[in-house]
């Protein structure tokens, strides 16, 4: 057997959404911060992402995380979040998966009943508290980066749909949030392709007409997620379908999307601090969110969210790159 590269991985899923945690084979990515490492990775190493996320090693909804040494003294590990759509500043379900893998594999000192793990991410420091019972990770609560509303009742002209009203919020990534009935579609997986097509059209229109940019980091820009809320959703329990570029649905309730949703509801005066919020995915799995603090991002009112969810280890693997492989960077259909 011949191979140009060997990548070591622990696979997991968080409430139905995969996280392939890369524990070796990448090396230390250049950069003095995880944000700089992300920029270097995107510019010089994106073939590693596509090799590991795209077919034939991955699939059209694959997600993962690359472990790195931290760039700051208060963190245990650095994390770079990868998926078919790109390299994210932050990923909530991925963080829950990473924290579970670190505990289940003994890559951190395990303390019962709670093991605290501090992760250095491109979006900032993220703290994960892992509930441990008999040595097993049973749930993870993450304290996410400050999240904020970037605009309520915004409008965008979408080809094939017309004028669409949406709220824009940030929870580690930017999210357009709107009721699914506002685009004339039912909340029904039988209509998933129509829902996905509408989501992609909306995010393309937003990015063409009014691309969002994080006020503290110009490298965090663009809307690549559209959260369609189901009829009957409110500030205590919300169901949604999360359409994601370049064309797939989140299987989990989406951690950064849950953070953005809570920031939106707080901005509307509907979700106070210290109140549980249940966010349910398109397949019926759930995260429990809570806003624990008000803060600011530049001059924007912001909130600090926590998200609680579960993940399970599904296997370990080594991924190779045979020098004769006709798809050295993978492919997508």
UniProtKB/Swiss-Prot annotation:
User: Which reaction is the catalytic activity of this chain?
Assistant: trans-4-hydroxy-L-proline = cis-4-hydroxy-D-proline
> Which keywords appear in this protein's UniProt record, sorted alphabetically?
Isomerase
Keyword Manganese applies: no
Q: So what does this one do?
A: Catalyzes the epimerization of trans-4-hydroxy-L-proline (t4LHyp) to cis-4-hydroxy-D-proline (c4DHyp). Is likely involved in a degradation pathway that converts t4LHyp to alpha-ketoglutarate. Displays no proline racemase activity.
Q: State the InterPro entries in the record.
A: Pro_racemase_fam
What's the source species for this entry? Streptosporangium roseum (strain ATCC 12428 / DSM 43021 / JCM 3005 / KCTC 9067 / NCIMB 10171 / NRRL 2505 / NI 9100)
Q: What is this protein called?
A: 4-hydroxyproline 2-epimerase
Q: Which domain of life is it from?
A: Bacteria
Residues annotated as the enzyme's active site: 91, 254
State its Enzyme Commission number(s).
5.1.1.8
Family of the protein in this entry: Belongs to the proline racemase family.
């Amino acid at each position: 057997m011949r191979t140009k590269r060997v990548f070591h991985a622990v696979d997991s899923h968080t409430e139905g959404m995969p996280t392939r945690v890369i524990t070796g084979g990448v090396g230390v990515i250049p950069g003095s911060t995880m944000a700089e490492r992300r920029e270097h990775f995107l510019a010089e190493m994106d073939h590693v992402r596509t090799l590991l996320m795209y077919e034939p090693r991955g699939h059209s909804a694959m997600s993962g995380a690359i472990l790195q040494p931290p760039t700051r003294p208060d963190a245990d590990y650095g994390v770079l979040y990868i998926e078919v759509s790109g390299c994210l500043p932050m990923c909530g379900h991925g963080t829950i998966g990473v924290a579970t893998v670190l505990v289940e594999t003994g890559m951190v000192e395990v303390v019962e009943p709670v093991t605290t793990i501090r992760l250095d991410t491109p979006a900032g420091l993220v703290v994960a508290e892992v509930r441990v019972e008999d040595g097993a990770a049973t749930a993870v609560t993450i304290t996410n980066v400050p999240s904020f509303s970037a605009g309520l009742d915004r409008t965008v002209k979408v080809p094939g749909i017309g004028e669409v009203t949406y709220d824009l919020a940030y929870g580690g990534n930017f999210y357009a949030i709107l009721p699914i009935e506002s685009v004339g579609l039912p909340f029904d997986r039988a209509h998933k392709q129509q829902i996905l097509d509408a989501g992609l059209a909306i995010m393309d229109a937003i990015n063409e007409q009014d691309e969002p940019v994080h006020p503290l980091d110009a490298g965090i820009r663009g809307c690549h997620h559209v959260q369609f809320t189901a009829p009957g959703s409110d500030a205590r329990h919300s169901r949604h379908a999360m359409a994601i570029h370049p064309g797939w649905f989140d299987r989990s309730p989406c951690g950064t999307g849950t953070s953005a949703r809570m920031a939106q509801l707080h901005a509307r005066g509907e979700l106070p601090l210290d109140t549980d919020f249940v966010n349910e995915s398109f397949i019926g799995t759930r995260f429990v969110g809570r806003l624990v603090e008000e803060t600011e991002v530049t001059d924007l009112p912001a909130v600090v969210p926590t998200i609680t969810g579960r993940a399970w280890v599904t296997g370990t693997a080594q991924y190779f790159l045979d020098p004769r492989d006709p798809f050295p960077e993978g492919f997508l259909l």
